[in-house]
Amino acid sequence: MKLLREISRIAKQFITFPINFGNYLFGTFYYDNFLSKSKKIYSGHISLNERVVIFLIFPEKGITKSHLRSLKHLIKNNYSPLVICNFPLPAQDQKEILNNCWTLIERKNYGYDFGGYREGILFLNEKLKKIDNLILINDSTWFPISHDNTYFDFIENTNLDFIGVTSHYGFPRLQLPTKRKDLTKPLNFNSKNRRFHYASYALSFSNKILKDKSFFNFW
């Protein structure tokens, strides 16, 4: 059974390789010269300050309470939301978002998370140098889960220039026990795995990174 799954996985990779390779080579050019012309930019009711969050959403079934709750929580913590929407919004949903953001950009769903983040960063452009902190999140991240501000407090109270909430391949893969008390061995974090990376759904960057031209050029 495992062999069949592996064969199926390899076959799918083989079939999609030409498309993926084409996107890798020409995807940015295709978006910038064709798809980006259809994007729409709207000014929201929240003013711009020194903290900005690029909040990427894909409300295929409409805006949810969690979207609005997250936006309100971000505003409460002095972040100006730049909402990137990868799905066209009906008028009422658009109105609710604009009441709780600095800027709304509606675009084609091209490039997934990083395509949306790129849209926001290119829009900010020279403003990046004046931003104290920039957060990139998507709508798989919910705020607030509890009444504390652990995430924002951590960002504010540390001197770290880059913060990723979770990582992949940062810990060895093992079968975890069903109860925490049975976890006897410590999990040792290690970023040297060649597949190591921080998850894209919640990233934080300080002004030191934002004002470096290499950051903008990356996008």
Give residue ranges: language-model regions.
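ER/Golgi luminal nucleotide-sugar-dependent glycosyltransferases, focusing on the catalytic module
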Residues: 1-219
